[in-house]
Amino acid sequence: MTIAPEGRRLLRVEARNAAVPIEKKPPWIKTRATMGPEYTELRSLVRREGLHTVCEEAGCPNIFECWEDREATFLIGGDQCTRRCDFCQIDTGKPADFDADEPRRVAESVQAMGLRYSTVTGVARDDLADGGAWLYAETVRQIHALNPGTGVELLIPDFNAEPDQLAEVFSSRPEVLAHNLETVPRVFKRIRPGFRYARSLSVLTAARDAGLVTKSNLILGMGETTAEAVEALADLHAAGCDLVTITQYLRPSPRHHPVERWVKPEEFVELSDEAERIGFLGVMAGPLVRSSYRAGRLWGQAMARRGLEVPPALAHLTEPTTSRQEAASLLR
C-alpha cells in the first residue's frame, strides 16, 4: 500500500503502519443495536432534514444509546486537520475556506433535533490567525442563544496554549470544556507529533482557572503500560481536570498506528476505580467508551458532586443510570 484513498502518497509513518495487518477484535468489543423510540424519531428527523452529525458519519457504535438520551456530536472547521495524530480518522491537509456561517447551522441542527445536550468538536486550524478560536466560541454562543435549555460540551485542540485564543473560547462558557490528552509521555511525540504533553495539561489548567468544568480522555492500546496510564490520570487531575473518559484504541485503517494491546474490561474497571481514588468528579471507562459518550450524564454527575445547581431542563442528567459501554456493565 503506497497510495492513500484520497490519491496522495503515503507518509513514511503511514507506510510503516500499513505493513502491519489490521488486528482481529476480541469478543468483548461489541455493541447491541437497541433502537428505542427517541432514537427512531431522531433518526427519521435527521434523514428528513438532511442534518449531519459525527455520530452517523463516523459510524459510532454508541449512537443508539446517546440519541435515545437526545445527545449528539457535531464536527466544525471542515474535514481536513492541520495536524496529524497517528490514531485519528480525520485526514490531514489544507483545510477548506473558513465558514463563518457554520455556527448558525450547527445551532439550528441542535434545535431541529431537539437535543438536550450536544458535543461540539473540530479540527485544528493552524492556518487561521486565531487558530479557529472564534469559530469554536461562536458555535457555543449560537447553540445557547437558540437553545437556552441545551447543554454544550466543547472539545477543543490546544490552540498552542495561546492565552488570547483560549480566553476567546472560554468566554463562550460551555457546560464542559474538554481537551483530550489521549496518551502517556513516553509515546506522546510518536502518537501526537503536533501536540505537547505539558502544553495539553496547561490548557486544562487554564480552563479550570477560568471556572469551567474540565474533561479529558485517555486511549489505551497505543504502547502505554497500565502504570503509565495511572500516572497520566494523576497528571490530569493535578492539572485541574474534573472528568475523564478511558477507552480502547480501535485502528481506523491500515495507515494508522497498530493496536499494541487489547485491554480487558477488568482492567478498565481497575483504572476507573483508580481514577475515582485520585479524585475525579466523574469517570467513564470501557472498550467502546468514547470521549463524548454519555457526555451529559458525566457533566450531571460532576455538578451533583460539586453541589452545584443544575438547570431544570437538564435535571434528568443527574438521575442514577447505567451506561451500556462502561466496563462494569460488560462484566455483569
Swiss-Prot record:
GO terms for molecular function: 4 iron, 4 sulfur cluster binding; lipoate synthase activity; metal ion binding. [4Fe-4S] cluster 2 binds at C81, C85, C88. Its EC number is 2.8.1.8. CDD domains: Radical_SAM. Residues 67-281 form the Radical SAM core domain. Gene3D superfamilies: Aldolase class I (3.20.20.70). Keywords: 4Fe-4S, Cytoplasm, Iron, Iron-sulfur, Metal-binding, S-adenosyl-L-methionine, Transferase. This is Lipoyl synthase.
